[in-house]
């Protein structure tokens, strides 16, 4: 008798969706959208040591994080044009593209939708302007030594891009940080 009851209880439990599958189904019902952004690893050609421009800003959870300058493409804009514009808006630096680096592709959930985001990154060189985080999107913009920049970056994908850029620029990997 006990075996039958426990078997019935097991079947009953297994026929009920788990909280994980409920969450997955709820997530699948959210509408999706595609977003495309661009930015770059901006190199300071005049510094005593190789330096890159980093910005600090608040993420979706309100935490202060450091990242590479980047932002959404505007209507009719190429990824390269958007990268140059976003770098100037977020850092005050006038930059030119040296090389296309890589794209990062990921998903996240925001405001009742799932977002598929692609971010195109470029290696860029500062050719003018003055670094400043004086705008409403960025808390701070700073030149950071290339060898120390990866330790500041909040996102693993950006750390990988920085290591790749360093190998391309200097022929060696970044120091652990």
Describe each PLM feature range:
Residues 10-11, 16-17, 76, 123, ...:
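A periodicity- and composition-biased signal for non-globular, repetitive helical segments
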Residues 55, 98, 102, 137, ...:
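Residue-level detector of alpha-helical recognition elements and their boundaries
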Residues 47-49, 112, 172:
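Short acidic/polar alpha-helix capping motifs at helix-coil junctions
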Residues 73-160:
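Unchanged
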Residues 3-4, 8-68:
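N-terminal strand-loop-strand
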Residues 67-70, 114, 150, 168-171:
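Short, charged/polar low-complexity linear motifs in solvent-exposed/disordered segments
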Residues 58-59, 71, 159, 167:
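Hydrophobic alpha-helical segments, especially transmembrane helices
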Residues 21-23, 156-177:
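Charged phosphate-binding loop/patch that engages nucleotide di/tri-phosphates or the phosphate backbone
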